[in-house]
Amino acid sequence: MEFLYSDEENYLKDRFFDFFNMNVDKDKYTSIGICGGRSIVNFLSVFLKQNFSFRRSHFFLVDERCVPLNDENSNYNLLNKNFFSKMVDKNLISISKFHAFVYSEIDEATAIHDYNIEFNSRFNIFDFIIVSVGEDGHIASLFPSRKLLFSDVEGYQYEYNSPKFPSKRISLTPKSLFGSKAVVLLFMGVDKKCALENFLASNSSINECPARLLKEHPNLLVLTNIKRDESYAGS
């Protein structure tokens, strides 16, 4: 694990961009997993700034809320409005490379099956994943003390009882998250301080802090603007 702290956000974004370039060859067919949220949009903006062209990369959501694509709670909607549409306008990516999960209340099983097939027909694993960590330590839609946190299958599954609204979501499973080739974890904002300390602590469990699922990943970059407590300075 490489751990980087800075109160200079641009420095962290530059380190993210460097790590991305070390792990993703834009001339090769690659899969990139992203979650929603303001921190993710902020870090992705470095690609706009750099006029980075995604010729062969495909983006998939690591989690999504079971809402219409135009709903204000949709991760796809947030990311499309604030990042992908701008990349399309600059001719840096085709919108077809951003794969949405289309939820169907009438046929939930087919909806998630189709999204799994959409990924599996193109890739075996994710080449690169960037996820932000929630206040409770959750990543994607893997929340503390939820059954999905301990799933041993690959791909996407439903979370029917999320502690955050809306309660019904899909999420990439722990096995698929850990199986990715490279991972970036973001702990951004003082409200994530407890989550960061639980992530670093030796006596904390995955059940308390799901982000710990990725702590032993062989190619993990952790970025934070949260000043660490002295007790964790040597972690």
Curated annotation (Swiss-Prot):
GO terms for biological process: carbohydrate metabolic process; pentose-phosphate shunt. Keywords: Hydrolase. It is an enzyme of class 3 (hydrolase). It comes from the Bacteria. Pfam families: Glucosamine_iso (PF01182). Its EC number is 3.1.1.31. One of its GO terms (molecular function) is 6-phosphogluconolactonase activity. Pathway: Carbohydrate degradation; pentose phosphate pathway; D-ribulose 5-phosphate from D-glucose 6-phosphate (oxidative stage): step 2/3. It catalyses: 6-phospho-D-glucono-1,5-lactone + H2O = 6-phospho-D-gluconate + H(+). Belongs to the glucosamine/galactosamine-6-phosphate isomerase family. 6-phosphogluconolactonase subfamily. Hydrolysis of 6-phosphogluconolactone to 6-phosphogluconate. This is 6-phosphogluconolactonase. It comes from Borreliella burgdorferi (strain ATCC 35210 / DSM 4680 / CIP 102532 / B31). The lineage of its organism: Bacteria, Pseudomonadati, Spirochaetota, Spirochaetia, Spirochaetales. The gene is pgl.
